[in-house]
Amino acid sequence: MKKKYDLIFGLGPACSASQAIRRAGLQSLSFPFDWIGPTFGQPGWDHDLQRRTNLICSEFKDWLRPEDFTFLGPHTNGKDKYYNNRLKLIFLHDFPVGSSFQGYFPTLVEKYRRRCTRLLELIRRSKKILIVRVERPDLDYRTPLDDCRYARKCLSEHFAPAQFDIVLLQCDTSLKRGEIREEPIEDGILRISLDYRNLEPGADIMQPDHGLTSVTLRERFSVREYRTQEEIAAWKAKQRAKRYARYGASNFLQYRWRKLMAALGGNGTGNA
């Protein structure tokens, strides 16, 4: 039987945690740690979960300061890379390539203000919360269990009476493909091991097979609907706009027709 939570969100170490949760249908809004991560292998990065916990418990007070950022150059995803020296976190998905740091920084602050406020409000409205960590498949790294205990203790005390559980997804290449091992470490901490390397030709070794990680979560956990009616309507409108844009459609009937034509081998515009 699936274990149901009021809120599920990822705490790294990379964006693959958020991707797995979203694909599993367990997260529908954006949170502050979805698309930022540590610089793996750098001094102090291995206590990443502790630092993120401290930021949440401080309610993100003064966490984004311009003097803490260092430009690292352009990223292959079309964004500029910036490293936050104090937080030991790298921002790979925010700054438009070639943009002025000073010019874009207020936009960054406002975006993360919304995400931080949203997360804190949802935590306060929730009784049972699940934190997900998805380790990178190419690194022999395991989130220290003492860091998990620290996170549960600090968050539970700060947001009492909310209950926080942690699930750790770890890539174990000694397991057969499709084999899954669940290890309840202690009350509130669960380790799930499987081989979730992405074996597609040319795949990025840092990225897991998101299909495997998302199915693993979806089969074990569920989440109640925590969005307001306004947020649901806005999300549906956004998804609808994406679908229409894909086929150059301006209304539902045009979208259905062009999608059908594309499926039949046409060019999606109604012309074979």
Q: Model-flagged regions — what are they?
A:
Residues 16, 102-108, 135-144, 174-175:
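Short acidic, S/G/P-rich loop/turn micro-motifs used as interaction or catalytic elements
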Residues 227-272:
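Membrane-proximal basic amphipathic "stem/tether" segments
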Residues 64-115:
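Long acidic/polar interaction regions in large eukaryotic complex-forming proteins
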Residues 28, 146-173, 185-190:
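Structural alpha-beta junctions
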Residues 105-117, 141-157, 210-215:
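Well-ordered, non-membrane alpha-helical segments in soluble/globular domains
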Residues 12-14, 85-96, 129-137, 171-172:
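Short loop/turn segments at strand-loop or loop-helix junctions that form parts
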Residues 8-81:
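Adenosine ribonucleotide-centric catalytic and binding domains
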Residues 167-233:
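Polybasic, proline/glycine-rich intrinsically disordered low-complexity segments
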